[in-house]
Amino acid sequence: MNGLLIGRFQPFHSGHLDAVLFALSRVENLWIGVGSSNKHNEKRNPFTADERREMIVSSIKPSIIDRTSIFNIPDVDDHEKWTFEIDQIVPKYDIVFTNDEFTKTLFGKRGIDVITVTLKEREKFSGTNIRQLITDDKNWHDLVPKGTQSVLEKINADQRLKNL
């Protein structure tokens, strides 16, 4: 059975890693969709799709990474069309994992099974919070996996975020 998990991953944090592990405990293969892949260098979307892909790959244990595939999911103007666009990008999936009510509704309307992913400490483990902590030179390192931390340091995320 194949599952789909979509997120912006700006950046990929420990809450996202927990969601990936949760999904992998329920499906054989997990398609990870990097949402808003066509956006970067914006305050809300500062990192490129390739940078986010690198964060994900470097954060997932090698023993399970082969059960995942990562796909770029660009934003489209029509929400209803969005789920069908995804079908053109990723292989067949049986279940969608999400914590987003709108995503649940869109896929649910199509009769696709949707499983709610409960994100731990949502306010603390949010991309918005982590980006702000990085910008303010406050401790953010314990909120992201080591792989993400390495990527953020390599690309000088602190300087990028301060300049947006």
Residue ranges, per PLM feature:
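Nucleotidyltransferase catalytic core that binds NTPs
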Residues: 1-164
